A protein has these predicted regions:
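Long amphipathic alpha-helical segments
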Residues: 1-57
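Short glycine-enriched loops at secondary-structure junctions
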Residues: 20, 71-74, 150
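Short glycine-/small-residue-rich flexible loop motifs, especially phosphate/cofactor-binding loops
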Residues: 27, 84, 153
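Conserved mid-sequence domains
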Residues: 43-143
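Short Gly/Pro-enriched loop/turn and capping motifs at secondary-structure junctions
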Residues: 124-127, 149-153
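Short beta-strand elements of ligand-binding domains
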Residues: 143-149
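Peripheral docking tails and interdomain loops at the edges
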Residues: 150-192
């Protein structure tokens, strides 16, 4: 079914209008006890595998570089993957660190890669609050954005980070549009 949708619609449309709403609904149904944790994990892992297939090669992009990570104890990464796929389709190079990433690992990646953007994601506010000092320190050294239901405007303002829109496709499109691009000129370089 997903393959037929991918053949008929743009990936961004499928992510925004089908997969993200489905995942929200699945999470709500799990919270109400209508689906088991096994069913939720099965559906999420099936979608994760398919999305990561779409992300194949995203580490070799030639545009700006983004490091994407879920905060420590955060396992829900599908929105972050959708965000990364959208950036990748806009020419970005994606370094995906995954769920439950230690802050020290995120900091080390930011220092060694020197990305144009670091994105931290979380579905609940506690990991953001627990690591707010490290987040503020990271924001002083790189362009940092916070995403997911756990990220708040107050935290973004206090730490110096940007707050992403809740829709990962719109968030990626907004970040891409906000990033400066190198200016190319057609002027000659001078005598050979």
């Amino acid at each position: 079914m997903l393959d037929r949708l991918l053949a008929a619609y743009r990936i961004e449309t499928i992510l925004r209008d089908l997969l993200v709403p489905y995942l929200h609904d699945l999470g709500e149904r799990w919270a109400r006890g209508e689906v088991s944790i096994a069913q939720e994990h099965f559906a999420s892992n099936l979608l994760r595998g398919r999305l990561l297939g779409l992300a194949r090669g995203w580490g070799q992009g030639h545009g700006p570089t983004a490091v994407l990570a879920c905060l420590p104890s955060e396992q829900h990464d599908l929105g972050l993957i959708a965000f990364g796929i959208t950036l990748y389709r806009r020419g970005w190079r994606i370094i995906y660190l995954g769920p439950d990433t230690p802050i020290a690992t995120i900091r080390q990646a930011a220092e060694s890669i020197a990305p144009d953007l670091v994105v931290l994601a979380g579905t609940v506010p506690e990991p953001f609050a627990d690591h707010s000092d490290a987040i503020a320190d990271l924001a002083r050294h790189t362009t940092l954005a916070l995403g997911g239901a756990g990220a708040t405007e107050e935290l973004a303002t206090r730490t110096g980070a940007r707050l992403l829109e809740q829709d990962p496709v719109s968030a990626a499109q907004s970040m891409d549009s906000a990033m400066p691009r190198p200016q190319h000129t057609s002027a000659p370089l001078g005598p050979a």
